[in-house]
C-alpha cells in the first residue's frame, strides 16, 4: 500500500495470473538461473549471488554451457530473441548470454551498475552491446526501456521473445536527476513498465 504501482497492477489484472508460483531462490543469480533454464540452481551450478570476480577461481563460476534456456528453445523454433538489461549469470565470454540463445544482448553482466555511468562496484564500465563492451549514455532504467521499445518496433512483424531485466529497484538507489529529490512513493520501474505496455498496444 505504501509504494504505488498502478501500471504493474494493471498488467497483473489484464494478464495471466499465476496462483501457485514459487521462486527457486531468494537472491539474483540463482533465481535468474531457474527462470531461464527451468531447473533448480543446484543442478545448473549457481547456488549463490555472483559478485564481480577478482581472482581466476571466481571467474570460472557461471551458467554452464550445457544448460538450455527458454531463449535457445524459442530461437531454434524461429523466434528472434533478446535480453535487454541485467544478465548476472557469469562474467567470462563463455558465460555470455549470446551463448545461451539470446541473439541480441544490450545491458550489463554484473549484479548492479551505477545508473548514470554504468560502472560496476570496482569502477569498471559494464555495459555491453552484443559481444562488445560499449557504454551508452543515459539513465539505466530509461535507457533499457527505450532499447526495448526499439527492439519491439524492429521485430513487430515476426515472432520474438524479449526478456527485459530491469536494474530497478536494485541498489545503488539513484534517480534520473543529479539531485536526490523526495517524490511520491511510486517505483520508477512501474512508470517504465507502463511505457512498454502502451508501446506494445500501438504496434
Predicted regions and their residues:
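Formylglycine-dependent sulfatase
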Residues: 1-203
